[in-house]
């Protein structure tokens, strides 16, 4: 027998559906993702820490869960919302169902609700806080709990997902016949500052020839002074970039000493370090089909995105240029310093899930690191 679950929002509305994954209660900021596939990568993306993800595609879970398509060591989302959850799956790599995977990771999910109506609400009103519960049956109480949740901008989420110790990474891209390809690269040495880095970012750097060392953001300066990398990479991560003071200070310390590249949160940190400002988007960019224009070449890239904040182009100093624009809302998707070896993109060129249009950025960065 299916167990009832309720999703209640801070605006007073609620949706009644069915439970899948773990039972219990969870809360967070609701965002929607437009990807048709890649739910396992989405679930394990540290940038989703503190959020409940709503999938716009209707059928989720039909290819199960495998051991390879993970972007961190555990599921990161606070909750999961889908229209139709598949409890039976079919894929040659699958090891378990999505339902089993969520249970193992203690993630509360809800299915069987009108996700189209929910997404329209988020799109029109903006991201809002919500609570999923299988234990509390009074929607009014759940609405009140949603309203009492802390704002995502008030939380230090990077601290929850970043590495605690330095470690080296040599796992490259995945080959369906041979598995992950490992490489013992020697040069250039790239220090990845881990604000919640996705595994596929590390794999892409290794596959392009870099030797990768992952460094926690706290005390990163001491680590960099010790290992003396050829370049610095600022990773993706959750939350408000203005709260990542350590990353902003680190970028300012080394922006005239080392080549630096940033992705997602790393892009915003670079923007702040260079003198710009950031702001929160109404409902963020989350999905694998966002068109971005490279203003230098005129080419259009289809990109994977997952961010809630953006750089204000009017705030950037004259020596920083905007290199990429989102064609859906004209927000900044890439910046570059005119004189220093620093560039960053707001989207995810490593895909996972998503297209491969922007792989060239890793090649450019590794070449820059080689001097």
UniProtKB/Swiss-Prot annotation:
Gene Ontology molecular function, alphabetical: ATP binding; carbamoyl-phosphate synthase (glutamine-hydrolyzing) activity; glutaminase activity
Taxonomy of the source species: Bacteria, Pseudomonadati, Aquificota, Aquificia, Aquificales
SMART domains, sorted: CPSase_sm_chain
Gene3D superfamilies for the chain: 3.40.50.880, Carbamoyl-phosphate synthase small subunit, N-terminal domain
Domain Glutamine amidotransferase type-1: 189-371
Intrachain disulfide bonds: none
Protein name per its UniProtKB record: Carbamoyl phosphate synthase small chain
Enzyme class: ligase
E.C. number(s) listed in UniProt: 6.3.5.5
Subunit structure: Composed of two chains; the small (or glutamine) chain promotes the hydrolysis of glutamine to ammonia, which is used by the large (or ammonia) chain to synthesize carbamoyl phosphate. Tetramer of heterodimers (alpha,beta)4.
Region (CPSase): 1-190
Superkingdom: Bacteria
Active-site positions on this chain: 264, 348, 350
Family per similarity comment: Belongs to the CarA family.
Catalytic activity, reaction form: hydrogencarbonate + L-glutamine + 2 ATP + H2O = carbamoyl phosphate + L-glutamate + 2 ADP + phosphate + 2 H(+)
One Gene Ontology CC term in the entry: cytoplasm
Pathway: Amino-acid biosynthesis; L-arginine biosynthesis; carbamoyl phosphate from bicarbonate: step 1/1; Pyrimidine metabolism; UMP biosynthesis via de novo pathway; (S)-dihydroorotate from bicarbonate: step 1/3
PANTHER family: CARBAMOYL-PHOSPHATE SYNTHASE SMALL CHAIN, MULTIFUNCTIONAL TRYPTOPHAN BIOSYNTHESIS PROTEIN-RELATED
């Amino acid at each position: 027998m299916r167990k009832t679950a309720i999703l209640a929002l801070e605006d007073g509305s609620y949706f009644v559906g069915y439970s899948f994954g773990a039972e219990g209660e969870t809360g967070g900021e609701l965002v929607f993702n437009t990807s048709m596939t890649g739910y396992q990568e989405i679930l394990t993306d540290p940038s989703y820490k503190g959020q409940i993800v709503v999938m716009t595609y209707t059928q989720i879970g039909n290819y199960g869960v495998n051991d390879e398509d993970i972007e961190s060591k555990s599921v990161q989302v606070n909750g999961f919302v889908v229209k139709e959850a598949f409890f039976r799956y079919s894929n040659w790599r699958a090891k378990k169902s999505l339902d089993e995977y969520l249970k193992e990771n203690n993630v509360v999910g809800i299915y069987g609700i009108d996700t189209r109506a929910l997404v329209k609400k988020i799109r029109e009103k903006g991201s809002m806080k919500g609570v999923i519960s299988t234990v509390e049956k009074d929607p009014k109480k759940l609405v009140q709990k949603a309203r009492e949740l802390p704002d995502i901008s008030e939380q230090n989420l990077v601290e929850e997902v970043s590495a605690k110790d330095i470690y080296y990474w040599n796992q490259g891209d995945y080959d369906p016949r041979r598995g992950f390809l490992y490489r013992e690269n020697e040069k250039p040495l790239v220090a990845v500052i881990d604000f919640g880095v996705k595994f596929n970012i590390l794999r892409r750097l290794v596959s392009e020839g870099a030797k990768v060392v992952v460094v926690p953001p706290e005390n990163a300066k001491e680590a960099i002074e010790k290992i003396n990398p050829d370049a610095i990479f600022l990773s993706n991560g959750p939350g408000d970039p203005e709260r990542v003071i350590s990353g902003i200070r680190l970028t300012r310390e080394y922006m005239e000493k080392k080549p630096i590249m940033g992705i997602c949160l790393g892009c915003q940190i670079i923007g702040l370090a260079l003198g710009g400002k950031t702001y929160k988007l109404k409902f963020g960019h989350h999905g694998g089909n966002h068109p971005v224009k490279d203003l230098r070449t005129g080419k259009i890239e289809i990109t994977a995105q997952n961010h809630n904040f953006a750089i204000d182009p009017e705030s950037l100093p004259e020596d920083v240029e905007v290199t990429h624009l989102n064609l859906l809302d004209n927000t900044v998707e890439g910046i570059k310093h005119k004189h220093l070896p620093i560039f960053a993109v707001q989207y995810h060129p490593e895909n996972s899930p998503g297209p491969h249009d922007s792989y060239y950025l890793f090649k450019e960065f590794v070449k820059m690191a080689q001097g």
